[in-house]
From Swiss-Prot:
NCBIfam families: argS (TIGR00456). This is Arginine--tRNA ligase. It comes from Streptococcus agalactiae serotype III (strain NEM316). It is an enzyme of class 6 (ligase). Belongs to the class-I aminoacyl-tRNA synthetase family. Pfam families: Arg_tRNA_synt_N, DALR_1, tRNA-synt_1d. Keywords: Aminoacyl-tRNA synthetase, ATP-binding, Cytoplasm, Ligase, Nucleotide-binding, Protein biosynthesis. SMART domains: Arg_tRNA_synt_N (SM01016), DALR_1 (SM00836). It is found in: Cytoplasm.
Length: 563
């Protein structure tokens, strides 16, 4: 039982009419540790108990008797709890040393599936930093849900269909060189895509020609299909090379094209439920009763289906295939109206499981404050960026530890980890400005800072030749080790909070906090002094390293043992 639940259960013994969940929500962490580890404000009980909060606080403090507390005292309207540092540190250290990397593993999900729609880059366009957020947020959420007992299903819903393929075919037929495309597929296709979009801005006929080629593609025209398949195959080769470098895997690559033959069923279902309404020649579903002003456009007047029709087919397919407990869409903020419509249409179709679908939006990545755009050629490509991050990490490692073995492997872990961590430490709905120098820094709130704290602890443990043992009686009661113990004890709750909020930044901030606490401890404590507490201090080091490594793993970041 964590300390908050312990305190809540003790308070409930004194005030049985109060729900434990209410008590938990009221508990506060005092700004000053001299006021205790946790405090309970008695204001909310004044009305029911018809007493002053100060008297209620005093009554509660007097009645609580537990050997888990050093003392419980009332200060004004607050009940302040001082936890028994020695007893709790002993429990926490034994638990982590016993569980190892499985510490904080929970079975909330009971093996149920969580479908995660993530990454989803567009075929024939380079994998840019703009795609990074969906990829690393989705990957981290998969790790987090796995940790609490769910079975994540990672779906790369590739952007492999749409009018842009009409544009690309027009561009290739105008200016394309097969040899050049085969040699450098993505680079060459990007040049063609940017060039055709620039021409379309001054020549309206380009758009019409692109629409015509896309219509041919929809009708399975052999030439259009062959070009489309080629663009797709070449792009996937490049994407998979990058995913390997980022250590990201998927369970499904079913993209937009996969649902081409599954949309007729959606239209039939909507018709059978009398949900389709004609509007200016198009077919729509009205959603006003859900507070959505604009109807969902299902089929255009020219018979073309739309993005939402495809997503309806995908939602039905995923429910039937995975029977998900949750279905998460890790897609940018700008798509929020689309996902509100998607859920509302499914609700209209009487699919109550639409309540289990969640859009997990995120903010934009900018460069120098400017929005990135593939179409305009203003883009930061991931591959050269990762290479530069690894080089920067390598030069810092060379300066810090020139004799390090496996320098290249460590530089890879630090460089790739730096990019991932910087993205994930940002509150998901906020954007951030891309700054590689800040990302790869060993100072400040960065991935390398946390990795370095972990490597430093491993160095201490090697020097001491520490072997964890559950038979030892580990116990600490100094202030600085107590700050670390409280964080480690809180780790299971932190993971659940990150899952509940679909927010990996909660884990990243926890890891930064734990690394900072340990570095402070390291600066003020002679860890290797041969005295009665040396084994307890080393156990604390071991537990901290275990939790730091697991925090980083949940973010998809490696933790080298040496840096």
């Amino acid at each position: 039982m964590d300390t908050k639940h312990l305190i809540a259960s003790e308070i409930q013994k004194v005030v049985p009419d109060m729900e434990q969940s209410t008590i938990l929500s009221l508990l506060e962490t005092p700004k000053n540790s001299s006021m205790g580890d946790l405090a309970f404000p008695a204001f909310s009980l004044a009305k029911t108990l018809r007493k002053a909060p100060q008297i209620i606080a005093s009554d509660i403090a007097e009645q609580i008797k537990s050997d888990q507390f050093e003392k419980v005292e009332a200060v004004g309207p607050y009940v302040n709890f001082f936890l028994d540092k020695a007893a709790i540190s002993s429990q926490v250290l034994k638990q982590v040393l016993s569980d190892g990397s499985a510490y904080a593993t929970q079975n909330i999900g009971e093996g149920r599936n969580v479908a995660i729609d993530m990454s989803s880059p567009n075929i024939a366009k380079p994998f840019s930093i703009g795609h990074l957020r969906s990829t690393v947020i989705g990957d981290s959420l998969a790790n987090i849900f796995d940790k609490i007992g769910y079975h994540p299903v990672k779906i790369n819903h590739l952007g492999d269909w749409g009018k842009q393929f009409g544009m690309l075919i027009v561009a290739y037929k105008k200016w394309g060189n097969e040899e050049a495309v085969r040699a450098h597929p993505i680079d060459e296709l990007l040049k063609l895509y940017v060039r055709i979009n620039a021409e379309a801005e001054t020549d309206p006929s380009v758009d019409e020609e692109a629409r015509e080629w896309f219509r041919k593609l929809e009708a399975n025209d052999p030439e259009a299909t062959e070009l489309w398949q080629w663009f797709r195959d070449e792009s996937l080769l490049e994407f998979n090379r990058l995913y390997d470098q980022m250590n990201v895997t998927f369970d499904s690559y079913n993209g937009e094209a996969f649902y081409n033959d599954k949309m007729d069923e959606v239209l039939e279902l909507l018709e059978s439920k009398n949900l389709l309404v004609e509007s200016k020649g198009a077919q729509v579903v009205n959603l006003e009763k859900y507070g959505i002003e604009h109807p969902a456009l299902i089929k255009k007047s020219d018979g073309a289906t739309l993005y939402i029709t495809r997503d309806l087919a995908a939602a039905l397919y995923r429910k039937r295939t995975y029977d998900f407990a949750k279905s998460i869409y890790v897609v940018g903020n700008e798509q929020s109206a689309h996902f509100k419509q998607l859920k509302a249409v499914l609700k209209e179709m009487d699919y109550d499981w639409s309540d289990d679908m969640t859009h997990v939006p995120f903010g934009l990545v900018t460069k120098g404050g400017a929005k990135l755009s593939t179409r305009k050629g203003n883009v930061i490509l991931l591959e050269p960026t990762v290479a530069e991050a690894i080089n920067r990490a390598a030069s810092q490692i060379e300066a810090k530890n020139p004799n390090l073995a496996d320098k290249d492997k460590v530089a890879q872990a630090v460089g790739v980890g730096a990019i991932k961590f910087y993205d994930l430490k940002t509150d998901r709905t906020n954007g951030y400005d891309f700054d590689l120098e800040a990302m790869v820094s060993f100072e400040g709130e960065t991935g390398p800072y946390v990795q370095y704290a972990h490597a430093r602890i491993q160095s201490i443990l090697r020097k001491a030749n520490f072997n964890p043992s559950n038979s030892d009686n580990y116990s600490l009661n100094d202030v600085e080790s107590w700050e670390i113990i409280k964080l480690i004890q809180d780790f299971p709750r932190i993971i659940v909070r990150a899952a509940d909020n679909f927010e990996p930044s909660i884990i990243a901030k926890f890891a930064i906090n734990l690394a900072q606490c340990f570095n402070k401890y390291y600066a003020h404590t002679r860890i290797l002094d041969e005295d009665a507490e040396i084994s307890s201090r080393l156990a604390l080091c071991y537990a901290t390293a275990t939790v730091l490594k697991e925090s980083l793993r949940l973010l998809g970041v490696d933790a080298p043992n040496e840096m």
